């Protein structure tokens, strides 16, 4: 077989056109930087869209992967596997919850949570309790159940009809929450910090009312921690600063240390809902991914990366606020740990392209939001490089 050229022309020939790829042939990574095959260096402020929490080339992560891979890479979930036990125990210790189910991705975690919520109601005799709700501007995934809970029309276009008995509550609208939930509601899914939606945090008032209504109507509260979890906001899970304990927590992205891994974590209330055969997966909880996940979590805890997320994130927010005083292009700044959204006056894609030319990788979401999701291990000096780059772009844009 001839080795294909690595460029955008070949990419169009080989793949379905799912991604608007950047013209970079990535060869390696170290710390907060990626390197191309031609030797160019890029500061990665995307981190695999929030996956690479401890950066690239961490020896502890590499050792965990190679040690487990040398023993076995896969066996059926019909067998007990130490990497699964170790990671599940760590997640339950952190969350103070009751049970774990491993899958392969965030969207699979959402699907499992939808199934569990409906089965929980059915097993309690509430066969009409099938409604599953989410919030506007949310993103929960691309498989049909998760897609049905996802707000943006561009993800839904052409895929209707979606799963019935799903719907949206207006984000942070307490009155709409009261209107939408009822005794037919099985679950409400919440991103406590919306990532794809532009880095927006749910309000204390909304969560207080959600708790009250969940008790009144006996529905489950599901925290989607796929992007905001594993320390990114400065707490291990973004729901933790709120006065709430969800019934289910969905986790993925950084959970596998860069390998495919997702999970739902359940409270004692839902601990007995799944029974053998009611839900499952061939590859979920892959032992190599679980070993990597444990190493990743231990690195976050040992290296104080949640505190680093708070400190570097605060430093970046302050810098952006000063930047906004001289650059009218910046309309709003939202920052929760190292989840940062900067609303700008035009399509954010422009700034993505300009930063790329200068060796910095940033992301655009919600049309006019620059989204930054760097490794939690990023230094203040590296963050300053990103800030200086964006400052220069804003300055040059104003002169044009």
UniProtKB/Swiss-Prot annotation:
Q: For this protein, what is the EC number?
A: 2.6.1.11
Q: Could you give the cofactor binding note from the entry?
A: Binds 1 pyridoxal phosphate per subunit.
**PTM-bearing positions, type N6-(pyridoxal phosphate)lysine:** 253
Q: Which residues bind pyridoxal 5'-phosphate?
A: 106-107, 139, 224-227, 282
A single GO BP term for this record reads: L-arginine biosynthetic process
- Residues that bind N(2)-acetyl-L-ornithine: 142, 281
Pfam families, A to Z? Aminotran_3
Family per record: Belongs to the class-III pyridoxal-phosphate-dependent aminotransferase family. ArgD subfamily.
Instruction: Mention any additional remark.
Output: May also have succinyldiaminopimelate aminotransferase activity, thus carrying out the corresponding step in lysine biosynthesis.
Record-given protein name: Acetylornithine aminotransferase
Q: Which organism is it from?
A: Chlorobaculum tepidum (strain ATCC 49652 / DSM 12025 / NBRC 103806 / TLS)
Taxonomy, top ranks, is: Bacteria, Pseudomonadati, Chlorobiota, Chlorobiia, Chlorobiales
UniProt lists the gene as: argD
């Amino acid at each position: 077989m001839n080795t294909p050229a690595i460029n955008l022309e070949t990419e169009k020939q080989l793949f379905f056109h799912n991604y608007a790829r950047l013209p970079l042939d990535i060869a390696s990574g170290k710390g907060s930087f990626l390197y191309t095959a031609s030797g160019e260096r890029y500061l990665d402020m995307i981190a695999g869209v929030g996956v690479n929490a401890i950066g690239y080339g961490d020896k502890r992560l590499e050792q965990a992967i190679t040690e487990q891979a040398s023993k076995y890479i896969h066996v059926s979930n019909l067998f007990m596997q130490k990497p699964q036990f170790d990671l599940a125990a760590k997640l339950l210790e952190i969350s103070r919850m009751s049970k774990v189910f491993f899958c392969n991705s965030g969207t699979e975690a959402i699907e499992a949570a939808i199934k569990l919520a409906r089965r929980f109601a059915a097993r309690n005799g509430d066969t009409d309790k099938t409604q599953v709700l989410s919030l506007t501007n949310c993103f929960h995934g691309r498989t049909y159940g998760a897609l049905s809970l996802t707000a943006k029309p561009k993800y839904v276009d052409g895929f209707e009809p979606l799963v019935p008995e799903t719907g949206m509550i207006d984000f942070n609208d307490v009155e709409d929450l009261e209107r939408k939930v009822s005794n037919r509601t099985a679950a409400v899914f919440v991103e406590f910090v919306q990532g794809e939606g532009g880095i927006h945090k749910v309000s204390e008032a909304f969560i207080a009312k959600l708790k009250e209504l969940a008790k009144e109507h006996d529905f489950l509260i599901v925290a989607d921690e796929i992007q905001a979890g594993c320390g990114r906001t400065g707490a291990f899970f973004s729901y933790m600063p709120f006065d709430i304990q969800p019934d289910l927590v969905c986790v993925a992205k950084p959970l596998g240390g860069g390998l495919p891994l997702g999970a739902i974590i359940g409270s004692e209330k839902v601990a007995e809902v799944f029974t053998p055969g009611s839900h499952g997966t061939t590859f979920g909880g892959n032992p190599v991914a679980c070993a990597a996940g444990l190493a990743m979590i231990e690195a976050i805890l040992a290296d104080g990366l949640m505190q680093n997320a708070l400190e570097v994130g605060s430093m970046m927010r302050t810098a952006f606020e000063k930047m906004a005083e001289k650059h009218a292009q910046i309309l709003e700044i939202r920052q929760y740990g190292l989840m940062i959204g900067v609303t700008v006056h035009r399509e954010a894609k422009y700034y993505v392209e300009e930063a790329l030319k200068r060796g910095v990788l940033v992301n655009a979401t919600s049309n006019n939001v620059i989204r930054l999701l760097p490794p939690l291990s990023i230094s203040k000096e590296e963050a300053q490089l990103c800030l200086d780059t964006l400052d220069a772009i804003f300055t040059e844009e104003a002169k044009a």
